Amino acid sequence: MRSRCTEIFFEPLDRTAVEKIAENSLRRAGISYEEGLCGRIAAYAGGGRDAVNLVQSLTSLAWMEGKKKITARELEWAAEAGRYQPLYRQKIAKQPQVGVVNGLGVQGNGRGTLLSVEAVVQKGGNGLTVTGIVEEEELKNGQGTAKRKSNARSAAENVLTLLEQFGFSAQDFYVHLNFPGGIPVDGPSAGVAMFLAVYSAFTEIPVAHTLALTGEVGLHGQVLPVGGVEQKLAAAKEAGATKVLIPKQNWKENYHNLGIEVIPVATVQELLGAVFLSEGAALSEGIDFLQEKEIG
């Protein structure tokens, strides 16, 4: 018989929904709790199931110790006992900064997250350092184990190669890219964020702190599609971003209704035009600037 089953995927719950689940679970348990506890539970919970499990641990602890009210102290104990770690939810910075850009990623639990990307450029040297990423990955198969270089580092190398094709020599500059925050980053989807961070550091033009972006960058300046765009857009909005750039091939019409400005771009030239619209910046202008000015 032909199967008529449909595979259904559920999107990860946002923090507000997880807080509501924790609140309902505590209410059903019939125990009082200090103000703000539901938000603290949501900070540890990767989803509704984690929230319910934490509440069950908390109510059991309160019952064993004869307590009538659950506090943050009990939550910390339950989280440590269950090996829950606070989930990383970064907010946008308060002001723009040269060489700093908001990238977007997806965590292991399927939730989107804001990723700060920092770039420093020094003239008179050469080389590339990328920190805060997964340096290499082990791939195991039936015939043994192989090691693969980090996709994030490969994306950074693509950025420098792209700049060289526009007349800039990477041999004259030392570039350091960093992903702060303690989360090992991998994957090519931070390519456009790294490109923009390096461009900002080169030209000393700050990028708006309310902007976030995602996309892979190709060697000829194309912005390539990536996964997890819906989760990334939700994370950008939650973090306080007001504008997000995504690959044109990832565009969907319903992105008009998200309460955040979503701009599709196909090339890095389009990206720079969208980012530096008021300055009228273009990549060629940035390269001319570099060739005329020493940057330390």
Predicted stretch roles:
Residues 1, 5, 18, 41, ...:
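Conserved RecA-like P-loop NTPase ATPase core
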Residues 4, 17-32, 57-61:
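Conserved AAA+ ATPase "sensor/coupling" helix adjacent to the nucleotide-binding pocket
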Residues 6-18, 265-266:
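Conserved AAA+ ATPase "SRH/arginine-finger" region at the nucleotide-binding site
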Residues 18-23, 32-46, 71-74:
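Short conserved motifs of the RecA-like P-loop NTPase core
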Residues 20, 88-89, 97, 121-296:
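Peripheral, non-AAA+ core regions of ATP-driven protein-machinery
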Residues 45-59, 69-72, 87:
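The conserved phosphate-sensing helix
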Residues 47-50, 57, 114-116, 120, ...:
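Conserved P-loop NTPase
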Residues 68-118:
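Extended amphipathic alpha-helical scaffolds
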